[in-house]
Amino acid sequence: VKRLLSIASVLGLSIGTAIAAAAPASAATDRTGAERLNIPNSSACRAGRTVLEGMVAGPGGQLYIIFSKGSAGEPVLSRWLRDGSTWDGASWVCSGAPVSMPELGHGNDLAYNPNYLGGGPALIATQGSQSAFPDDDVTIVHLGSDGSIGSTQVVDLPTGNISGLCYSATAAGGAGKYAARRLGSLWTHPGSGALTSGWTLVKSNLTYHDNRSDQGIDCSENYIWNTNSINTNTPDTGWNWVYQYNWSGGDVESDIGIPGNNLTDEIEDITHVGGEFFVGINRNGGLADSVKVLTE
């Protein structure tokens, strides 16, 4: 991914006119929701890393975020605890210093499986990105029963390099299902069984936007959400985009837009807790990172 080396933040989304792959987009309507988390550079949960990478909600609505030094790497995995049952301006609290984890690679996306191969909860991080950091490995991060970060293992995928990965425990009639994505290709995998085999390419011409970079994806019982960020080839007036597909890769809603704010704000990932959706934006100019609601 051609990244803007910047400071992360998370913004809400806005919807635009549906378009075909690689077609120019029209102006979108901002669908930004309320801020739920603000992450300044001084936060202990980022350990001096300035770039927000993958993000996912885990057990009990805890939030896990990868921060890195951009092309310099040195990723860390941070954990944020839910602060009560009310969604407000401080919905998560930093659990302390993050874990240095070189095996995360680029850490472009995070998925959460509450019972990975029957062995309990785990995060799954993509080591690769769209093109700048190609890698077909993913890193399994085992979690304790309380969501604490534990041991890791690396798994090689037969799909080749992927940039986005998600898991839904409620998909496939409750059997669970994975989705993986890179550019126009979408693969799925049953919820059970090793990730080293069993993948199916379900579509090779997904709708997405030109002059944008692959970022994280999220999935639920019936849908998959894909994020495309601004990059160094995007016009100054360009937007970030989210696309909603069904599990066959068919369009449900296209060009859900997030303002790029003159190439300041770069979407990185999308995740949900129950019916609440959140997006993560990496920002330039020393601005604090933020997690905000996606209003549907």
Region locations from a protein language model:
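Beta-strand-rich domains and repeat architectures in extracellular enzymes and scaffolds
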Residues: 41-75, 106-109
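Secretory targeting and sorting signals
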Residues: 1-27
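Structural motif
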Residues: 71-83, 130-142, 183-192, 232-244, ...
